[in-house]
């Protein structure tokens, strides 16, 4: 009996040892996995910080370019000037490439908060039945694939979203008009920070956003001046809408393609080209001049940084003060790709 008892005790002891070994192995594996995750996380954080420092290091060069080419009100912005050349920084384990783009190649929806410019006193053109900005926005929405009726509805919702009051254009409460929206939300009653906010409007079809976001934007300003010197032929619908349809999209594309290599020197030079080549635009010329410019004060810097571990993309929105030339970043968005 003593022998059998001893054997049982040895068996139990062996079983306990095996259980402890299994538990220790599982714990060691878990510790190893956690260590690898922490190590990888640390490498990502170091790489991300390294790329951010490199991007911040490019800020001075970007500032110099914009102050040289974009400051001032009278000079036209050359489409392919030094400001538009890619800026590349290479380090021991990373590469950062930044591209400056003109952010005034779209209609600023926040300008709907300002009163429409008054028509010239000597204008012989027939006065429109709708405000000019309303016509422009609705036409751009229609060009984005939205029906005429839906475009009118979206425009009214957009105005309600931006203005500070709590009533709609039809004197109803905005809270009632937005009551059936899911998920529940109310108009912001302030400027849009990004044009993606337009997707929050109840009547806006999300499928139209890819096209609408190319011609509409949200700048922190109540003015909307489209820089005709940096428009591309694919943005002809925007120029056509600014002309209240006087220029067809094909005409607008040809006008953009015929732009001088260094861009138009002034709005008057642009207007002269427009009137000479498209005489039908004469009646709308004075109205159109209120919405076009040959330079820009808002820019977008698209930076891409690469290391062995990750890719970091940063989009910075920049404003250049037209008087002092001060360059200020008013928005920055990060996106990390592992």
Which residues are covered by each model-predicted region?
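Compositionally biased linear targeting/interaction segments
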Residues: 2-338
């Amino acid at each position: 009996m003593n022998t059998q008892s001893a054997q049982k005790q040895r068996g139990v002891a062996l079983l306990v040892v095996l259980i402890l070994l299994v538990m220790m192995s599982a714990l060691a594996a878990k510790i190893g996995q956690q260590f690898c995750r922490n190590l990888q996380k640390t490498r990502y954080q170091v790489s991300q910080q390294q790329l951010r420092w490199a991007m911040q290091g490019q800020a001075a060069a970007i500032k110099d370019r914009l102050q040289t080419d974009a400051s001032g009100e009278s000079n036209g912005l050359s489409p392919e000037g030094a400001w538009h050349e890619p800026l590349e920084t290479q380090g021991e384990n990373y590469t950062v490439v930044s591209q400056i783009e003109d952010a005034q190649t779209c209609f600023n929806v926040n300008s709907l908060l300002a009163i429409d410019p008054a028509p010239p006193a000597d204008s012989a053109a027939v006065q429109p039945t709708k405000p000019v900005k309303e016509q422009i926005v609705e036409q751009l929405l229609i060009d984005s694939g939205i029906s005429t009726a839906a475009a009118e509805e979206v425009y009214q919702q957009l105005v309600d979203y931006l203005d500070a009051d709590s009533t709609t254009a039809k004197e109803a409460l905005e809270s009632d008009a937005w009551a059936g929206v899911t998920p529940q939300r109310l108009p912001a009653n302030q400027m849009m920070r990004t044009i993606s906010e337009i997707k929050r409007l109840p009547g806006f079809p999300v499928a139209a956003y890819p096209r609408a976001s190319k011609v509409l934007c949200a700048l922190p300003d109540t003015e909307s001046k489209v820089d005709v010197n940096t428009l591309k032929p694919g943005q002809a619908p925007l120029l056509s809408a600014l002309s209240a349809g006087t220029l067809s999209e094909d005409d607008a594309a040809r006008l953009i393609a015929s732009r001088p290599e260094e861009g138009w020197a002034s709005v008057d030079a642009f207007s002269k080209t427009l009137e000479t080549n498209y005489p039908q635009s004469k009646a709308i010329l004075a109205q159109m001049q209120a919405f076009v410019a040959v330079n820009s004060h808002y820019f977008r810097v698209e930076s891409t940084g690469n290391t062995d571990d990750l890719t970091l993309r940063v989009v910075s929105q920049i404003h250049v003060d037209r008087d002092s030339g001060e360059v200020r970043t008013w928005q920055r968005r990060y996106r990390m790709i592992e």
